[in-house]
Amino acid sequence: MSVTMVRQKIKDGGLEEAEAAVRDLFATFDRVGLEGVRYASTRVVDSSTFVILFELAEGIEDPRMTIPEYPRFLERLKGWVDGSPVIEQLDVVGSYNLFGTQREESAVR
């Protein structure tokens, strides 16, 4: 399984608008449902840097672009960002209920 991590800084003065847009977008995702997607948008405390984690189940087409609000959000995002995003692929080594990993029951000895 692979998880994409995006770090993006937001311009001064755009933070509140960006946060509101993210909340609206995630409310839309909750309303319509995204099958096979795990997605979180977080902000580093006391900073204007967002960290986004995105996981797409194997064999699934990314459903975000089929929701009209998502491309509109991406277009608006262009006016808020400060610099290019840092995009990295992560290999999940361990996870407890965060990503789509199955926990194996360990035997108590």
Where does each model-flagged region fall?
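Active-site-flanking beta-strand signature of metal-NTP-handling nucleotidyl enzymes
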Residues: S2-K9, V51-L53
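Short, surface-exposed ligand-recognition loops at beta-strand->loop->(often short) alpha-helix junctions
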Residues: K9-A20
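Short coil/turn motifs at secondary-structure junctions
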Residues: K11-G13, A57-G59, G94
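Hydrophobic alpha-helical membrane-association signature
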Residues: A21-V22, E69
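An amphipathic, aromatic/His-enriched active-site/gating alpha helix that lines ligand/cofactor pockets
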Residues: A27-V37, F54-Q89
